[in-house]
Amino acid sequence: MDTSDEDIAGTEERPMAARFQLVIDCADPEPLARFWAAALDYELEPPPDGFATWDAYWRDLGVPEEELGTGADRIVDPSGRAPRIWFQVVPERKAVKNRLHLDIGVSGGRAVPIETRRQRVDAEATRLADLGALLVGVHETEGLDHYAVAMEDPEGNEFDIN
């Protein structure tokens, strides 16, 4: 069958690039949102125009009272380039290793001397530990010119700094 004239991927029906948000399951969204906003230089997402708070917005949409959160459950990149992150309340606690994690790049890459990269990574790890993160381990492979640290956010979600 000749498919040369067909749009197999369906791009004709998708006039713009797909956008996504990252969703992080958690027990208490507000402190986790504040942690990650500080970690990533994000900010808490302001309520939509015309609303003083997220609660007012959700109530206007008819969301039941028992489903309302604090409103401080989503963060955005102030530049608008990186994805929005939403912190979703779930009843269960984290039980196993994440299948997806964030890497926070602060070292400058391999063009930067390893000692400088190590200092940058360690300084960021200290900053995030002061915000509530836990240092889990150091990844340094001799001969591979690589240095990173593994950490957990305040609810135990793994992330790396490199």
Regions from the PLM with identified roles:
Residues 15, 27-38:
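Hydrophobic ligand-binding cavity/cleft-lining segments
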Residues 34, 44-52:
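Eukaryotic partner-binding/assembly regions in large regulatory complexes
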